[in-house]
Amino acid sequence: EVIASQPVDPDLVISTLTQPQFHGAAHMYQKHMTQHMIDVIPRDWMKTVTNVFLLRHPARVISSFSKKYENPTLHDIGFQKQIELFRFLLDAGHNPVIVNSHDIIRFPEKTLKKLCSHLSLDFDPVMLCWDIGGSRYDGVWAKYWYGAVHRSSGFSEPEGTLPDLPKKLQSLEKRALSHY
């Protein structure tokens, strides 16, 4: 369903991702997940955009991911690929921004102001809230992943302590921590 909903030709996708204006907008936000950044697709296009890495503690990623995938692997949760992509950009002379999801949730205004400043964008307080429900830009995967966001109208309360993972996932957390 997801693959059928959009182009699969890498050149066409890259062309869309790097066009100067998207639907007339001067700036375009793109969310990429590491499992979509497969090795056979060229990465040079990443050098033409500003990259921000949003990190989340491995225990939180694993806890969330394991609700959708029965036995997630280190490859599935993407920490190794994040390091690889980050190093690719460093080697190309870029200095990608790293934002920890904990900071956005705990200090949304402060964190977004810093991010906007780094990206040479104006901060607008409207960034701190949104209408409940989905967006036409969500994509077909929204019904699988965006339930909590669709029920919200702003940033949630700060996250509590790290989740206790089942024993079978604790070694995965330990391996992921070395890449975090």
Model-derived segments and spans:
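PAPS-dependent sulfation machinery
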Residues: 1-42
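PAPS-dependent sulfotransferase catalytic domain
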Residues: 30-126, 140-148
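PAPS-dependent sulfotransferases, especially Golgi type II membrane carbohydrate sulfotransferases
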Residues: 122-180
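Residues that form generic nucleotide/phosphate-binding pockets
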Residues: 16-20, 64, 85-88, 168, ...
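Generic hydrophobic, helix-prone segments enriched in Leu/Val/Ile
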Residues: 1, 53, 176-180
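A structural signal for well-ordered alpha-helical scaffolds and beta->alpha junctions
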Residues: 6-11, 75, 79-82, 108-112, ...
